Amino acid sequence: MTAAVNDAPALDLEVQYVVAWRAGLPPEAAFRRWVSAALAAGGHTGPAALAVRVVDKAEGRRLNHDYRGRDYPTNVLSFPFEAPPGLDEPLPELGDLVICAPVVEREAREQGKPEADHWAHLVVHGVLHLLGYDHEAAEEAEAMEGLERRILAGLGIADPYRLDEQ
């Protein structure tokens, strides 16, 4: 296996734009940078494969309803890969992220955040879920948010939770 730039593990990233427009949406290179930063900080050292699907409100709502029982579009959904039983070797597949573009844009506007920064935060947040991080309990939330803050700071992005608290 050939190492990628800076000896980072190989990343097989598929970005699917399933919206009627692409103007203003992050390019694949941005997604790659955000995913790579989250994988490194989240402790993932091997090759990784995942998909990021950018969707409209209708698909975001349908998926949120079908998988979480909530009848509205949400910003990001994470679908971790589940290996088939009896598999001896780990696979690089981590899972899929679904990000609802109109929700991201609305939230960024409402929170007074640059859209690109909010996209980065949601990608990092989703990747950490794929790596097994969660925020159901207060201690888990504190640890996950702290890691998100560090990753985003490394990308030159302000603390998203500080902005939420203002």
From Swiss-Prot:
GO CC term (a single one): cytoplasm
Compartments reported by the entry: Cytoplasm
Keyword Nuclease belongs to the record: yes
Positions bound to Zn(2+): H125, H129, H135
Entry note: cofactor: Binds 1 zinc ion.
Keywords per UniProt: Cytoplasm, Endonuclease, Hydrolase, Metal-binding, Nuclease, Ribosome biogenesis, rRNA processing, Zinc
Cofactor: Zn(2+)
Domain of life: Bacteria
Chief subcellular location: cytoplasm
Any one of the GO BP annotations: rRNA processing
Function, as annotated: Single strand-specific metallo-endoribonuclease involved in late-stage 70S ribosome quality control and in maturation of the 3' terminus of the 16S rRNA.
Family: Belongs to the endoribonuclease YbeY family.
NCBIfam families named among the record's database cross-references: rRNA maturation RNase YbeY
HAMAP family in the cross-refs: Endoribonucl_YbeY
Protein name: Endoribonuclease YbeY
Taxonomic lineage: Bacteria, Pseudomonadati, Pseudomonadota, Gammaproteobacteria, Chromatiales
Gene (name only): ybeY
